[in-house]
Each structure stands twice: as C-alpha cells, then as structure tokens.
Amino acid sequence: MLTGVPAAQRQAIKGHPPGVVWLTGLSGAGKSTLAAALETSLIRRGAHTMLLDGDSLRSGLNSDLGFSTHDRAQNVLRAAQVCNLMVDAGLLVIVAMISPLAQARELARSQLRHTAFLEVYINAPLAVCELRDPKGLYKRV
C-alpha cells in the first residue's frame, strides 16, 4: 500500500507491531464478549487497537450479502481487506465473526500474510450456544 509513513516508523510511533487476532466459532460462543475483553486489556497496556465485529460488518459494509457459500466467503474476504487497511495504519485488529468456511478463513490469512495473524476458535459447547442464542438461530420450530 502506498503510504507516506514507513511501517517501521508507524511501529515506533505505536510502540508495537501491527497484527490480527481472528476469533471464530459458533453463534453464541462468546466471540464478541472475548474480543471486547481482549481489546480492553490491550488498550490498558497502551496498544492501538480496532475491533471488527461480524454483526456490525453485516449491518454495514456487508449488508448486501446473504448467507450463501459465496456470500459467506465474501463476508470474510471484505473483513480481511478492512484488516489490511488497519494493519497498514499500525493497529492491532481483533476480528470477531463466525466465519464458518475454512477456505474463506485461509483466504483471509493469505490476504494478511505480511502481518502476524492469529486465528482462535472459541470452542463453546453447542448446548451453551443454544442456551445463549442471541440471534434466535438455534430456535426450534
């Protein structure tokens, strides 16, 4: 990306290297809650962060997407592209989104290959996710 400030200079200004922590898991697993707690902890340590939540992206940037395999992959790819912009700005980016397709997550990782990328699967039991069910996705009819 074309920028007037070299990456090393941004890192010196921010006091840390940029990177991405990508939280994935079932709906109701606690991704958004954990992402918010992680961001709070990092900010307390002086880090410059940005939290990208899948629900926020779905209601804004990705509001034109449905839930087909193609659209789910596009949802993840667009999030990765936003991450690239944030990483170029020297931020630690925390992404919290279901991102169910392994191939799409791998594409996201490849889009961010020039930065530290940590994928974390939040392994909450299905029964817990069903109890929480913030979006009504597990509701039985």
What do these predicted regions represent?
Residues 31:
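Conserved lysine of the Walker
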Residues 1-21, 45-48:
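Extreme N-terminal, non-catalytic leader segments
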Residues 7-10, 80-81, 105-107:
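A generic local structural motif
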Residues 21, 52, 118-120:
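Hydrophobic/aromatic beta-strand patches that form the interior of the parallel beta-sheet core
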Residues 28:
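Walker A (P-loop) phosphate-binding loop of P-loop NTPases
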Residues 36-84, 88:
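Conserved substrate/cofactor phosphate-moiety recognition/catalytic segment
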Residues 60-67, 83-141:
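ATP-dependent NMP and nucleoside kinases share a basic, alpha-helical "lid"
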